[in-house]
Amino acid sequence: MSIDFNNSDYDFLHLHGAWARERHIERTPLLIGTQSVESRRGSSSHNQNPFIALLSKDANEEHGDVYGFNLVYSGNFLAQAEVDQYKTTRVSLGINPFDFSWLLKPNESFQTPEVVMVYSSNGLGEMSRTYHKLYRKRYKPSIKPRRTNRWTCR
């Protein structure tokens, strides 16, 4: 997935971590060139999460423009923001091309992972709440009630 923005006046945000210290926020100014987050370990995880965001310089939890991008995929990924010589920004997310190849035979298809994009004019908090609502509604599997015969479970 790629999407272009007409300017580069944003901060770049991503999440990283380790065991027992997941989801640390890393926020840096967006610069000319490419800023990226990736996994080549065969999985996405708390080390590098397949999520990035572009934020207006004044954005915080309660106000400011935030564009969030989350790849719904648990394998190798590449998420990047590239600013060109005209100060336009291109955000790209997808399967990491490192060590990846897929030969499509005639009449075969390949479905790429989905990217869920969220815009908030009310800061990171609203973006986060929107993601939570979307994932609970669309991606959370429905749990069917189970009946257990406790009488025979002694």
What are these regions, as identified by a protein language model?
Residues 1-140, 144:
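N-terminal accessory beta-strand-rich subdomains and adjacent acidic, glycine-rich linkers
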